[in-house]
Amino acid sequence: MLQVLAPFYSNLSGLILLPLLGSLIILVIPNSRVRLIRGITIWTSLITFLYSLFFWIRFENDTAKFQFVETIRWLPYSNINFYIGIDGISLFFVILTTFLTPICILVGFYSVKSYKKEYMIAFFICESFLIAVFCSLDLLIFYVFFESVLIPMFIIIGVWGSRQRKIKAAYQFFLYTLMGSLFMLLAILFIFFQTGTTDLQILLTTEFSERRQILLWIAFFASFSVKVPMVPVHIWLPEAHVEAPTAGSVILAGILLKLGTYGFLRFSIPMFPEATLYFTPFIYTLSVIAIIYTSLTTIRQIDLKKIIAYSSVAHMNFVTIGMFSLNIQGIEGSILLMLSHGLVSSALFLCVGALYDRHKTRIVKYYGGLVSTMPIFSTIFLFFTLANMSLPGTSSFIGEFLILVGAFQRNSLVATLAALGMILGAAYSLWLYNRVVFGNFKPNFILKFSDLNRREVLIFLPFIVGVIWMGVYPEVFLECMHTSVSNLVQHGKFD
């Protein structure tokens, strides 16, 4: 049935516009019609997710060309077009975006107490911009949506954040990411004036001198490194996570952290191959420092969200090591780990959100002995804790294994230090689980709170299925991205 219908639903611009259409519909509905707003938002987000699956169904694994390409004239007096398409690298990021959005909306309806309609509109706009980022094949269009994502996220953190410092965290998030991206804008303008185009496919055939590649690479790095984030521009992330609502943390960890690493893969590495080789030792150094530093910092944290936030920094810098190994195994492993992190970290933030909804605190010392009062939660939390420490059979293990294989081929010392980071990751993951679920039982504090209800368990089920699926049968994902990754490596002559 899906195969028959798929040819009629393979329009990327329609996928981008669908969440915006949903936001326009609920915009005109009165705030008092809560059930109608909830129904429209949930169904719109689910339809968007199903719509994105049609692109996977129709995707041709054996071609490195961009598929479902659309070109719309944007600026008539210049060679800048609304140019979109997807390949094996971007496909799953689009699906991950549409997968997480309905979950965020469902969580928000029960956790957000004010401005619910505006909350849904903000998430729909954010989803639309994120899909456009992953589909953009024009540098300027990419930049526009890359920066536009900041607006709904700024509002989500600043309006629906959980504590008094939410405004400061929102401004910190906005300014850090915006200031870094100004350098990328200058680089894009330079490229346009030098080549007369911002079309990615044309630019991939354009050879820049080594000196220009280095300068342009640095400009793009200034933007993407903040989004990863890499040390020392990671300060905004823990604060943003702590202050953001649960659903905001899910989108932030699940999707927004992938924008920087995706930017490296889509633009920096293929457009500036000589500069990429030149700066690879620099990236390795920063990544190893970030993995070890943030892992040790995580062990010292007392806030549940900060623990997961710092672990996200470590995982994303593990991704950059695999990506800059510049071989097929490392890059495919980095993509898999990004997808896995999008599932595992999102689920962990949902676990923290479930505790916060009941106990109104995220401080570790107030928890202990939850296994006796919340056995279902304890089991689910254990599963995602094990996935976070890359237990074999889970999605994270496959990604990190391929990254280590690729990194050993490029630099065995870096791979060894990255493996040390995995050990530290296991240490803080088990420490966290032991303190929260076992430890000293605090009856006066937690006895009156209930276990997860049916709705909350159903929210976790898709994450469990995804983590097991990627961990047990990763070939489904690898075969889609392999041709595109191979073409990337061959194009840069990295072999």
UniProtKB/Swiss-Prot annotation:
Catalytic activity: a ubiquinone + NADH + 5 H(+)(in) = a ubiquinol + NAD(+) + 4 H(+)(out)
GO molecular function, one term: NADH dehydrogenase (ubiquinone) activity
Transmembrane portions of the chain: 9-29, 37-57, 89-109, 118-138, 139-159, 173-193, 214-234, 245-265, 272-292, 307-327, 335-355, 367-387, 413-433, 457-477
A Gene Ontology BP annotation from the UniProt entry: ATP synthesis coupled electron transport
Keyword Membrane among UniProt keywords: yes
Location(s) in or outside the cell: Mitochondrion membrane
Class of the enzyme per the UniProt entry, highest EC level: translocase
Membrane topology: Multi-pass membrane protein
Domain of life: Eukaryota
Assigned EC number: 7.1.1.2
Keyword terms, alphabetized: Electron transport, Membrane, Mitochondrion, NAD, Respiratory chain, Translocase, Transmembrane, Transmembrane helix, Transport, Ubiquinone
Chief location category: mitochondrion
Keyword Translocase: yes
GO cellular component terms, A-Z: mitochondrial membrane
Role of this protein: Core subunit of the mitochondrial membrane respiratory chain NADH dehydrogenase (Complex I) that is believed to belong to the minimal assembly required for catalysis. Complex I functions in the transfer of electrons from NADH to the respiratory chain. The immediate electron acceptor for the enzyme is believed to be ubiquinone.
Similarity comment: Belongs to the complex I subunit 4 family.
Name of the protein this chain belongs to: NADH-ubiquinone oxidoreductase chain 4
